[in-house]
């Protein structure tokens, strides 16, 4: 609120939102109160971005299941807050990781110190360590050992756009091998490494070294934290404002 004399003006900011997203670590979006100006996101404002969460999530789950069955090592770059939780939930519900390797479930490595701290904060609600054979990797030494291993595994690491984080270190070992796969689960800005790989780059520059991209690349469509066209229209039609300023648009 901005007060000037007896006049009070209210500006509201939506931030990123998805009206269908469910999470134990992020509260559902609530309608803004009456505002003079609303500054709202419209990342996926193109009507062609519409999708059915239930139907299209099923397709994503089938894609994940097929990748786990077919490939040796799978890297899933992910944002530490909420996205990691969504991925772990889908891995558990698809039951794909229950396939046995040497009598054990396929291990799922959560290789991100921040994501591990968030997971521990919500461990009672999430509880995937036994369900998924989930292993929390916090030290750099543990991460290096996993990077250089050739065991069958699923690695969930930040960052989602590959502009920082341990996912970059894993890429060096994942990409050259055609028996490996990378599963992207979110938006990638045009100036990011994730964008290059998603759009077919056959080689990338990483730490001054040219790395061949022989891995299989998958793009999942239903993990975004941004509302699609229909959700945006419904949300903005149901809040009260004098002026709407749309930002963060395609």
Q: Each PLM stretch: what is its role?
A:
Residues 10-11, 37, 154, 181, ...:
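Structural motif
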Residues 142-145, 186, 198-208:
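Long, charged, low-complexity intrinsically disordered regions
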Residues 17-20, 45, 160-163, 174, ...:
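Short beta->alpha connector loops
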Residues 30-34, 101-103, 173-178, 210, ...:
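Short, conserved loop/helix-junction motifs that constitute active-site signature segments
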Residues 1-86, 90-104:
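His/Asp/Glu-rich metal-coordinating catalytic cores
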Residues 204-235:
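Generic long, charged, amphipathic alpha-helical segments
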Residues 60-192, 247:
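Hard-cation-handling environments
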Residues 61, 165-174, 224-239:
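A short, acidic, amphipathic alpha-helical segment used as a generic capping/interface helix at domain edges
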């Amino acid at each position: 609120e901005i007060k000037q004399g007896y006049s009070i003006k209210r500006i509201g900011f939506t931030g990123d939102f998805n009206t269908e997203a469910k999470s134990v670590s992020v509260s559902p979006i609530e309608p803004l109160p009456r505002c003079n100006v609303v500054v709202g996101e419209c990342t996926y404002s193109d009507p062609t971005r519409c999708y059915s969460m239930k139907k299209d999530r099923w397709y994503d789950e089938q894609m994940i299941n097929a990748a786990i069955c077919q490939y040796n090592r799978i890297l899933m770059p992910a944002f530490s807050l909420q996205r990691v939780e969504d991925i772990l939930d889908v891995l558990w519900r698809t039951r794909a990781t229950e396939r046995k390797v040497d009598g054990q479930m396929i291990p799922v490595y959560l290789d991100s110190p921040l994501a591990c701290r968030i997971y521990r904060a919500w461990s009672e609600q999430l509880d995937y360590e036994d369900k998924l054979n989930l292993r929390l990797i916090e030290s750099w030494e543990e991460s290096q050992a996993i990077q250089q291993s050739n065991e069958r595994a699923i690695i969930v690491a930040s960052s989602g756009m590959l502009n920082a984080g341990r996912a970059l270190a894993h890429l060096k070992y994942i990409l050259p091998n055609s028996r490996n796969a990378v599963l992207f689960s979110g938006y990638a800005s045009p100036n990011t490494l994730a964008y290059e790989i998603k759009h077919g780059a056959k080689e990338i520059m990483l730490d001054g070294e040219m790395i061949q991209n022989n891995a299989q690349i998958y793009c999942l469509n239903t993990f975004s934290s941004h509302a699609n066209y229909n959700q945006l229209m419904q949300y903005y039609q149901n809040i009260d404002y004098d002026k709407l300023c749309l930002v963060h648009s395609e």
